[in-house]
Curated annotation (Swiss-Prot):
Organism: Pan troglodytes (Chimpanzee)
Protein name as catalogued: Trace amine-associated receptor 6
Family, as annotated: Belongs to the G-protein coupled receptor 1 family.
Protein's gene: TAAR6
Membrane-topology annotation of the record: Multi-pass membrane protein
Segments on the Cytoplasmic side according to the record's topology features: 54-68, 129-147, 224-259, 303-345
Extracellular side: 1-32, 90-107, 169-202, 277-282
Pfam families on file: 7tm_1
Entry keyword Cell membrane: yes
PANTHER family: HISTAMINE RECEPTOR-RELATED G-PROTEIN COUPLED RECEPTOR, TRACE AMINE-ASSOCIATED RECEPTOR 6
Domain notes per entry: In addition to the well known disulfide bond common to G-protein coupled receptor 1 family, trace amine-associated receptors (TAARs) contain an unique disulfide bond (Cys-22-Cys-186) connecting the N-terminus to the extracellular Loop 2 (ECL2), which is required for agonist-induced receptor activation.
UniProt KW Cytoplasm keyword: no
Subcellular location: Cell membrane
Major subcellular site: membrane
């Protein structure tokens, strides 16, 4: 972004005839087209990719499992980011102005925080689910049931929505920073200034679950490695049917854990720059240039578009489900009971 200044061609007001209007930074037509394509592609992928995930899991009975219900709910959170957050943030970033009103700015910010925290909660519960599944695959079905999954999903939605609504609709997030907030929030702007206390709470809310997930997945892969060695050592011996079944179940759960582990890592990488930037701004006087802030935001937003790509890369059943949905076979009465899995696990 060192060439950022070369992209700027003019400076004018967002609302030329209104006092207190924000300054609009205009980019060259070519740059604007490129930015709209890049951001628009992310929004479209987040909407339609996650919509495919939700339809796949909810329609095909073979995919009705506690883990997949969590994945579908996670896809719903990412879908809502693509619908309610990314399109409006795209216009704000490219036009450097907010044209949707002050009330919608608050709603947009609230949705941004709520749905992103909802994703984090879902991933944390998925990590716990995978830990139980890999460490004790035969007992797992009795521990992590559909009702338990439903409780996890409810918590993953209710707490973030309550937290986000309470913080942004009461105005407590900028206590002590009212002058700075008034200066930044000119007419045509939608910049949320958060004080140190709330930034610290936000960062702890990100780093603590992240640390828990790292520990869980670290243990998962240690257990998976031990299981793989055990299977390898007993491979030449005659296995009983129960031992063979346990090996197949363990192999399947390890594969699922690997895929969902990639999803967790992608989330961490996407959100880490934004979390660090928030800390720097809160404790060093909001020194981050606007374009750095926008890059951090869009790295985080793009995470909502990544998960469907990860599923398509690692899950053959998801690729098959997409084919069935796109070709219209999903409209057949028998499609819900279709076999999406290969014979070999």
């Amino acid at each position: 972004m060192s060439s950022n200044s070369s992209l700027l061609v003019a400076v004018q007001l967002c609302y030329p005839n209104v006092n207190g209007s924000c300054v609009e930074t205009l980019y060259s037509p070519g740059s604007r087209v490129i930015l709209y394509i890049v951001f628009g592609f992310g929004a479209v992928l987040a909407v339609f990719g996650n919509l495919l995930v939700m339809i796949s899991i909810l329609h095909f009975k073979q995919l009705h499992s506690p883990t997949n219900f969590l994945v579908a709910s996670l896809a719903c959170a990412d879908f809502l980011v693509g619908v309610t957050v990314m399109p409006f943030s795209m216009v704000r970033t490219v036009e450097s102005c907010w044209y949707f009103g002050r009330s919608f700015c608050t709603f947009h910010t609230c949705c941004d925080v709520a749905f992103c925290y909802s994703s984090l909660f879902h991933l944390c519960f998925i990590s716990i689910d995978r830990y139980i599944a890999v460490t004790d695959p035969l007992v797992y079905p009795t521990k992590f049931t559909v009702s338990v999954s439903g409780i996890c999903i409810s918590v993953s939605w209710i707490l973030p929505l309550m937290y986000s609504g309470a913080v942004f609709y009461t105005g407590v997030y900028d206590d002590g920073l009212e002058e700075l907030s008034d200066a930044l929030n000119c007419i045509g702007g939608c910049q949320t200034v958060v004080n140190q206390n709330w930034v610290l709470i936000d960062c702890l809310s990100f780093f603590i679950p992240t640390f828990i997930m790292i520990i869980l997945y670290g243990n998962i892969f240690l257990v998976a490695r031990r299981q793989a060695k055990k299977i390898e050592n007993t491979g030449s011996k005659t296995e009983s049917s129960s031992e063979s079944y346990k090996a197949r179940v363990a192999r399947r759960e390890r594969k699922a854990a690997k895929t969902l582990g990639v999803t967790v890592v992608a989330f961490m990488i996407s959100w880490l720059p934004y979390s660090i930037d928030s800390l720097i701004d809160a404790f060093m006087g909001f020194i981050t240039p606007a374009y750095i802030y926008e890059i951090c935001c869009w790295c985080a937003y793009y995470n909502s578009a990544m998960n469907p790509l990860i599923y398509a890369l690692f899950y053959p059943w998801f690729r098959k489900a997409i084919k069935v949905i796109v070709t219209g076979q999903v409209l057949k009465n028998s499609s819900a009971t279709m076999n999406l899995f290969s014979e070999h696990i």
